[in-house]
């Protein structure tokens, strides 16, 4: 099975001080060990780099070089499928924004969900499952709920 990754999950895996680092790392390891794959969209990596280099969020943010190296590692990982938002994803994004009457604060999550769904990804690794519950087509797997 292929699982899309949300930025919140990537942050938890990469930031050792993150409250859910151990759980996220364990879950990722378990999924990969059983042969599952991860799907990653470019917007996740852009948000990751933006967040981890922010001096207002962290006492010791990553340097841009470290952030970019980690981003490239996710993008080029053998167990990762690169997923780009193609025409069908944009159509689905517009449809879902209207169907679910979502506002401006839901734009990026909706585009991410549509990008993954258009690539036949139906599972999402996230720490923010409530942001995606409106999309029946995706099942969210929060790290704390896996044993």
Task: Describe the residue ranges of each PLM region.
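Active-site neighborhoods of divalent-metal-dependent phosphate/nucleic-acid chemistry enzymes
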Residues: 61, 80-127
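Hydrophobic helix-cap positions at the C-terminus of alpha-helices
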Residues: 30-31, 74, 96, 100
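Acidic, PIN/NYN-like endoribonuclease modules and their adjacent C-terminal/linker elements
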Residues: 2, 110-147
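Alpha-helix/helix-capping structural signal
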Residues: 8-9, 43, 111, 130
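Short, conserved active-site loop motifs that form the nucleotide-linked donor/cofactor pocket
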Residues: 36, 80-81, 138
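Short, well-structured N-terminal submotif of metal-dependent ribonuclease cores
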Residues: 1-40, 55-69, 147
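Short beta-strand segments at enzyme active-site cores
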Residues: 39-42, 126
